[in-house]
């Protein structure tokens, strides 16, 4: 099996290196990752300029694009042999609850699944690499076990690993996405020439983080696994809309 590895922290991220090291002695791996940090890129594709891959000294391929670009090109002809799986991460920072809407890490996995490859997104609950070996351990464990899952064909597994030594992890929990409150307002700044600018502020506080959510699992010391689907259709919305449409047909 050939695995395509990508991320949104960039090709020089220690999380990417740890993921590659964990998987490369299990199976063949190729890395295509953004040439700079693309956190928050979501599923964006680069359409306003050409993409230029560059092979680095360590064999990783750096691309001047988004995580989704990396996976799209990796499956659509950049490689001599197409990968059979996509693994994204290890992100330095959580992708919990509503974070998945913005995450380039999750988006890379979604693109892989959209292009009919089993896909994982792995995130580690720290910006520092101190317990990164724990995340790498669970990435290897789940990738090796993927054929036993029997998942629906348009499903991605979003995995978040606590910042703990391996021996302190309490286990693995299957979870749903929690939810955050509204994000803080952007922060206005003024440059030396008097021009206004804005920094996007931090994500909102956890609003729905009770038992059964990904937020709750990681706080309790568990690895959280949340199945995500590509189809975002909200079936429960049909009935109320149908009632409104009945008299207008």
UniProtKB/Swiss-Prot annotation:
Names of required cofactors: a divalent metal cation
Record-listed a divalent metal cation binding positions: 8-9, 39, 91
GO cellular component: a single term: cytoplasm
Compartments reported by the entry: Cytoplasm
Keyword terms, alphabetized: Cytoplasm, Hydrolase, Metal-binding, Nucleotide-binding
Cofactor note: Binds 1 divalent metal cation per subunit.
Enzyme class: hydrolase
Pfam families reported in the protein's UniProt record: SurE (PF01975)
GO molecular function terms attached to this record: 3'-nucleotidase activity; 5'-nucleotidase activity; exopolyphosphatase activity; metal ion binding; nucleotide binding
Catalyzed chemical reaction(s): a ribonucleoside 5'-phosphate + H2O = a ribonucleoside + phosphate
InterPro entries: SurE, SurE-like_Pase/nucleotidase, SurE-like_sf
Enzyme Commission no: 3.1.3.5
Top-level taxon in the UniProt lineage: Bacteria
Family per similarity comment: Belongs to the SurE nucleotidase family.
Function: Nucleotidase that shows phosphatase activity on nucleoside 5'-monophosphates.
Name assigned to this protein: 5'-nucleotidase SurE
Organism: Pseudomonas syringae pv. tomato (strain ATCC BAA-871 / DC3000)
Encoding gene (name): surE
């Amino acid at each position: 099996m050939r695995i395509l590895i990508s991320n949104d922290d960039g090709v020089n991220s220690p999380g990417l290196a740890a993921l590659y090291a964990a998987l490369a002695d299990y199976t063949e791996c190729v890395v295509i990752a953004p040439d700079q940090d693309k956190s928050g890129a979501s599923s964006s594709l680069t359409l306003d300029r050409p993409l230029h891959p560059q092979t680095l000294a360590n064999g990783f391929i750096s691309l001047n694009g988004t995580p989704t670009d990396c996976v799209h090109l990796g499956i659509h002809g950049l490689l001599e042999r197409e990968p059979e799986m996509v693994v994204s991460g290890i992100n330095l920072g959580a992708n919990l609850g509503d974070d998945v809407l913005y995450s380039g890490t999750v988006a890379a996995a979604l693109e892989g699944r959209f292009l009919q490859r089993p896909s994982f997104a792995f995130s580690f609950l720290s910006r520092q690499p101190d317990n990164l070996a724990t995340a790498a351990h669970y990435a290897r464990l789940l990738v090796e076990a993927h054929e036993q899952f029997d998942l629906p064909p348009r499903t991605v597994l979003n995995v978040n690993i606590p910042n703990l030594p391996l021996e302190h992890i309490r286990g693995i929990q299957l979870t749903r996405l929690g939810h955050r409150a509204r994000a803080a307002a952007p922060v206005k700044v003024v440059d030396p020439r008097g021009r206004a600018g804005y920094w996007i502020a931090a994500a909102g506080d956890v609003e729905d983080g009770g038992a059964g959510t990904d937020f709750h699992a990681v706080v309790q010391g568990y690895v959280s696994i949340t199945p995500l689907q590509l189809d975002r259709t909200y079936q429960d919305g049909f009935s109320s809309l149908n009632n409104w449409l009945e008299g207008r047909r």
